């Protein structure tokens, strides 16, 4: 018989309100409280800006790492709405910043496609930061609201008139939450370069206050990405093959180039998120490549009906490929 324990009654059931749950169990939302989780904060804010870009409302994102350990992300998108929310009777900005599963990404008319943590991202960043300040530029005004560890620290303030449009999120990761709060320039730089390749024409800049700075913008998009990956390799094609199509609201973009290497290098993304474990888009690409090249070889008499068909591994030998899909309602096994 198990030993008798303390009484377990209704008053011992706790309900965590608002972002308290995020602070209590941060790893549930960002994976860890170590280096990876820390940088996930930056990625989440940037993902919001990228979502604006994917939906045609933003072409510039600027990230700055400040000397005090804070980070600011500025975009020239539409700006988070600041008018009063009809249900909650507070500014929409406050709802977005302080409540989980709040945002425009659940409305298909506002965001056709989006990445990130599906509506919890920026509020999680707020909850896991010592302080956060958001400046919004829209509808002829410059607005500001500040927060402390997920709680509203000041009401929405109209700072001035402004012809600008966009959002500036400035936050300081909380030392009470993270094992380290040192943001790494090189790690962020690598991710932002990747995002610039995946979103042709989007300019993403990263800088350190008083230090290094770099800006990425690739009009050639995925084709430039493949050329970058194949730098130093002997290619069998002068330029990468670029494929773009849309089927049933799914945008598919791929760039392919074969080299003399033996290994294949295929990188796949869904809504700008790397799908390292593959998925139906990768299996579809592989089967389509094998089927298409076999059909072409038969039509050109390079293969005869009685010959053995080309194997998938033979077709993909030396291939460098970037496959990027944009899906309205993606289902991720994990990010």
Language model regions located:
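Bergerat-fold GHKL ATPase/HATPase_c domain
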Residues: 1-46, 95
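GHKL-type ATPase core
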Residues: 2-11, 69-86, 92, 103-228
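Conserved helix-loop functional segments at active or binding sites
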Residues: 21-24, 28, 51, 55, ...
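Flexible beta-alpha connector loops of hexameric P-loop NTPases
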Residues: 28-37, 81-87, 178, 273-277
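Conserved ATP-binding N-box helix of the HATPase_c
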Residues: 36-60, 121-128
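Short beta-strand/loop element within the Bergerat-fold HATPase_c
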Residues: 60-67
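GHKL/Histidine-kinase-like ATPase module
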Residues: 186, 193-195, 201, 205-335
């Amino acid at each position: 018989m198990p030993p008798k324990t303390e009484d377990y009654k209704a008053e011992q059931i706790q309900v965590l309100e608002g972002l308290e749950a995020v602070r209590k169990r941060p790893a549930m939302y960002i994976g860890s409280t170590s280096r990876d989780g820390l940088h996930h904060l930056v990625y989440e804010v940037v993902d919001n800006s990228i979502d604006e870009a994917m939906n045609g409302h933003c072409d510039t994102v600027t990230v700055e790492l400040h000397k005090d350990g804070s980070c600011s992300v500025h975009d020239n998108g539409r700006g988070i709405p600041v008018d009063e929310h009809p249900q909650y009777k507070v500014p929409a900005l406050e709802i977005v910043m302080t409540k989980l599963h709040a945002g425009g990404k659940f409305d298909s008319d506002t965001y056709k496609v989006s990445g990130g943590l599906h509506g919890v991202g920026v509020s999680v960043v707020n909850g896991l930061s010592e302080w956060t300040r958001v400046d919004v530029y829209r509808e002829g005004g410059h607005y500001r609201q500040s927060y402390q560890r997920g709680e509203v620290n000041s009401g929405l303030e109209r700072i001035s008139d402004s012809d600008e449009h966009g959002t500036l999120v400035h936050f300081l990761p909380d030392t009470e939450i993270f094992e380290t709060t040192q943001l790494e320039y090189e790690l962020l730089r690598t991710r932002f370069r990747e995002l610039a390749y995946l979103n042709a024409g989007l300019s993403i800049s990263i800088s350190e206050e008083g230090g290094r700075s770099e800006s990425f913008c690739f009009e050639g998009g995925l084709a430039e990405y493949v050329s970058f990956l194949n730098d130093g390799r002997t290619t069998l094609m002068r330029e990468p093959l670029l494929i773009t199509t849309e089927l049933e609201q799914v945008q598919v973009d791929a760039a392919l180039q074969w080299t003399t290497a033996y290994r294949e290098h295929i990188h796949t993304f869904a809504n700008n998120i790397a799908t390292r474990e593959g998925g139906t888009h990768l299996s579809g690409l592989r089967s389509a490549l094998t089927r298409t090249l076999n059909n072409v070889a038969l039509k050109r008499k390079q293969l005869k009906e009685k010959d053995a068909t080309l194997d998938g591994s033979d077709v993909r030998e030396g291939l460098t490929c970037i496959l990027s899909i944009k899906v309205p309602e993606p289902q991720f096994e994990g990010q």
